[in-house]
Amino acid sequence: MTRSPPSRRSARRRPRGSGRLGPAGAAPLVTVVALSLFLSGFCSIISELSLFNLAEGLLGGTNANLTYTMGLMMFAMGLGSAFTAHRWFRNVSVEMFIGVECALSVLTMISVAGIYLLAGWLPGSAAILIWTVSPLVGLLVGLEIPIVMRINEVLGLRLRLNVALVMAPDYFGALAAFVLFTFLLLPWLGLGRVAWLGGLLNLLVAGLVALMFRAHLRHPLAVPAGVGVLLVLAGGLGWRMPDLMAFAEQLHYRDGIAQARETPYQRIVVTDRRRKGNPAYRAPALSGKVLARRGSIVLREIRGRHAAYCAEDIRLFINGGLQFSTCDEHRYHEMLVHPALSLVENPRQVLVLGGGDGLAVRELLKYEGLAVHLVELDGVMVELFRDDPRFARLNGGALADSRVEITVGDALRFLRETRRRYDLIVMDFPDPHQTGTARLYSTQFFRFAGRALAPGGVLATQSMSPLFHPRAFLSVRKTMRAAGFQVVSLQVPMLTFEHWGFQVGSRRQSEGEMQARLEAFRPAVPTRYLNREAVQAAWRWSKEFLLDAADVPINDQFTLPLPGLYRETLRR
């Protein structure tokens, strides 16, 4: 008696635990896979945003960080997708999917803390580490999507539905990461725990897949157990993450960290020499990226970590860059405020843009009858230097003074919308090392500032080091002139910043008239550094320096050449 051939339906059946997939139970698997893709997109973007923020602190806030993180990840995603055409991926399985998810989760969880630690122990390694981790994340994401599409194909999904099911959750997860990262996760959890959370969520879904579909696994006990072990280790890592990040962060600072705050806008760190710091801290002469060479002179970048010492040294760092040191901040703020104010007849209203540490406000409040309006983007900065007695004493309690009005918001938006007029506008912004801060030194910004000036009003701004960033310094000068200001450039020697520059502009007074008034400058209030001779020296420059600006571009907000000029340093 001859047997009839098996039907196609029976031929497609797979033995239990074979690792192969079939249409049976497809609906719950599809749902879990869609959730996994959502969290995978969330995890990958969280990882890259965390690395991008870390790169701002370790490498400096430049647009190149987008290439080092997002750019490399997208490129590696393409490589990962291409790899799935290899014969190794011919027969996909749930185990393969779980393995990729676990690898992505672990890499995300340890990426920030691991790079931060290694960069502290191995100065100069940060860029290499970030260039390595970012594409690895992209490679795993690139592997994951084609694997899921093949799994869905085995489950019998049509191509159109398959593509929609795979791509839509991934993109939705990416959007959720972008929205939640800046305004919720980063301020609440900090950089290390945000990356850890992204990896943990992805790992939980991998565990859910392993439990729900053990029948499809070749190793139905070992795989869920392995994911469980990873979850236990992840829990321990999350518990110790704040201590681990604090230890890693201290490696990057000579002095002990007195306060560290993460905000939606920046990482704020305040150090105090009297606190125990990093005993293995390397002086700038021994470490750091070489920026330029001139004969036997070597200029190195040390992320704003300078080796100057004084009896009491409290320093503010934003995203790893030094903003001030109590060794010499009085020189900076006295030169920023007093010469410009001396050019105004009977000043009454002063606007300070930036300067949330209150040190420029402190200098202004030395004058009787002045009302000061401070506009600062980061409210946490204001709270720190107004409410914490350790730091409020540095500005003499200026931010709590009744003569000071504080607005937390964007400076450009404020200038666009305000109808108030000010006798003096003081701009105390961070350096324009990226497009976000470079817009604050653009022609359009200076025009808005000029519109907010009262007749005869004066505008003063810091403008980087004329020694280390000469073309950027000259670009700010030319940009102010293009915005309709006559400009006098000032300079001051410092311990921490070596040599710093400022621009003072007026639409009513000529450059010669302002120079004549500065020549006769006498401090009207007590100062620590500034006197008549210091101001007389501050506005005098060599003929060669100021005339060497012919090929320096104006910083228009649509081209923004200033970040590139800032990075040129001593190329001349």
PLM region descriptions:
Residues 266, 509-572:
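SAM/dcSAM-binding transferase cores
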Residues 333-334:
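Feature captures the catalytic cores and cofactor-binding loops of soluble hydro-lyases/lyases
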Residues 2-310, 320-321, 325-328, 337-349, ...:
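Alpha-helical transmembrane segments of multi-pass membrane proteins
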